[in-house]
């Protein structure tokens, strides 16, 4: 068990580097990585979400009732800024339909699971970050399909009901199961969560393997455009999230949490939805996969920057 914990700690610490290496391998040498199929994406995402559920406790939801304003501000920013920024970038860069769908899906998804760790590293308000992630994830089955319909409905047929059912199945059900297991078998989960970074990172890496290796040729021809759009989307999310907090005169720790929570998305869910509901557009899965790689890099850099500025204050 101790060996697994050490491996898990290593993987958690160097997740960004591991993701980059694997993504590059799947891009330039897709053959060996193509053993991981895109049909596995939903199952792999479910594993990540189950792991998230194992870490949730009733106390994590207290911030919703003790500081509703902060959570509301953060979640409203999450579901207004990122979808709009995604749509705006698809228009500015005249993205083809299949790429535009993928970018919009990233924008309409809830906060990413690694945002809580980045907020902790940034010396931000961790309780607010956890609360925002939990609430935005619970709201996702309703808001993600509706926002996707709003921003992508002019380009493609969007079935909000089917998307709702998909999100419930691959996100809410695994989280709820993890939460229940943690509640009734707390001593077991205390041991299990020690190797959670290893399990979650492995699942995320496999999702990236599946998507990148299956679309390597197309990524090679349009990869730079996708990367530019994804980077801008992510960075603008950080910037506007922080700006909203400052405009509403929230303290710096809250601004950091909102900034990171808004900028980091559950891009695995975006990839899952693209594969399940827009299979006729294979490239729609790519923005989510690229975002998964990029936001772990940018999140770590931003967290380090925020932490340094906090030390100087």
Residue locations for each model-derived region?
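Alpha-helical transmembrane segments of multi-pass small-molecule/ion transporters
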Residues: 1-313
